[in-house]
């Protein structure tokens, strides 16, 4: 049954993409809309010959590929009893190779070290993609970087995107027992939760009232949200052709050139508001599970034992370096 549902979801998703493309071209942008090559290639994604039917991914165009470095290659262990197995999880960082938030240059290397230590401890992969040669803003480069990582790691089942201005603090927590193990995921997913979006003033879209292990397998994006909506500083993407197609759409330049949304997070909110089929593949996790902030209300603020702290917005008060140094001392 789960396999049948997965196949049906792929068919529905392809039809959805065609519908979205038609809607954007005809109704929203009219004659001023200039379709990008990515949109024109959507129909070809599933027409390519595939040696392995379920995991073939179309390679990115060369101008959308960054310099990729595997800082830790997980050891494949088919006897690993966990689901997913540790070597099936890849942590991903992509940036222009510089420090963020006006922090000292050495914080970039400290970030790399933080990810390497965690990946080694749990036998996860860790990939870094330098996107400096891409002619797009870094926040929009995360989508092609994820696809590139999917292609480089065909054994992976999940890619964990984590922003550069975040630290893994509790290195003893494994991703499986904390989030991705099927039973744990069903328990942690937020039910009947409004999906916050800057486009949703006239509509409250809720997450399902319940999940089963089978229904959770249909989710392709696991993310948290704050008061402003879905936050793309820390999220998990299932490696699949369907999600590669979604990422291709999410990163399409037509959306930013035609100012549909100010940034990639807002565009995700646009999809949630206007495309229920996309909303249906998104699972909402409690923010403090994967994306705690240094300050904030109890449902978003960091507490001892949390997996991650994300210094989102630290630049507003020019406190990025102070916070980084303070919490780096708490890594354990």
Swiss-Prot record:
Main location: Golgi
Function: Involved in the galactosylation of the N-linked core oligosaccharide Man(9)GlcNAc(2).
EC number per UniProt: 2.4.1.-
Localization in the cell: Golgi apparatus membrane
Keyword field: Glycoprotein, Glycosyltransferase, Golgi apparatus, Membrane, Signal-anchor, Transferase, Transmembrane, Transmembrane helix
Transmembrane segment boundaries: 11-31
PANTHER family noted in UniProt: ALPHA-1,2-GALACTOSYLTRANSFERASE GMH3-RELATED, ALPHA-1,6-MANNOSYLTRANSFERASE MNN11-RELATED
GO-annotated molecular function: alpha-1,2-galactosyltransferase activity
Family per record: Belongs to the glycosyltransferase 34 family.
Record protein name field: Alpha-1,2-galactosyltransferase gmh3
Residues in the Lumenal compartment per record: 32-332
């Amino acid at each position: 049954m789960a396999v049948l549902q997965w196949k049906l979801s792929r068919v529905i998703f392809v039809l959805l993409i065609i519908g979205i493309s038609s809607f954007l071209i005809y109704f929203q942008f009219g004659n001023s809309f200039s379709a990008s090559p990515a949109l024109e290639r959507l129909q070809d994604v599933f027409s390519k010959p595939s040696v392995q039917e379920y995991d073939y991914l179309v390679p990115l165009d060369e101008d959308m590929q960054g310099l990729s470095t595997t800082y830790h290659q997980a050891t494949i262990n088919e006897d690993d009893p966990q689901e997913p197995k540790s070597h099936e999880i890849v942590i991903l960082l992509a940036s222009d190779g510089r420090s963020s938030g006006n922090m000292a240059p050495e914080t970039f290397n400290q970030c790399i070290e933080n990810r390497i230590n965690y990946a080694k401890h749990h036998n996860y992969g860790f990939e870094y993609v330098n996107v400096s040669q891409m002619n797009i803003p870094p926040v929009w480069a995360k989508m092609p970087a994820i696809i590139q990582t999917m292609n480089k790691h065909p054994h992976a089942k999940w890619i964990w995107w984590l922003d550069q201005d975040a630290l893994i603090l509790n290195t003893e927590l494994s991703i499986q027992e904390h989030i991705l193990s099927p039973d744990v995921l069903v328990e942690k997913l937020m039910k009947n939760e409004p999906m916050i979006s800057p486009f949703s003033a006239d509509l409250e879209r809720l997450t399902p009232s319940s999940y089963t292990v089978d229904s959770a397998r249909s989710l392709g994006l696991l993310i948290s949200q704050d008061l402003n909506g879905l936050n793309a500083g820390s999220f998990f993407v299932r490696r699949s052709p369907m999600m590669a197609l979604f990422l291709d759409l999410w990163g399409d330049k037509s959306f930013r050139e035609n100012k549909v949304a100010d940034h990639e997070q807002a565009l995700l909110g646009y999809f949630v508001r206007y495309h229920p089929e996309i909303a249906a593949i998104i699972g909402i996790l409690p923010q403090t599970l994967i994306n705690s902030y240094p300050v904030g209300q109890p449902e978003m603020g960091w507490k001892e034992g949390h997996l991650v702290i994300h210094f989102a917005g630290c630049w507003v008060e020019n406190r990025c370096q102070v916070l980084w140094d303070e919490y780096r001392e708490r890594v354990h």
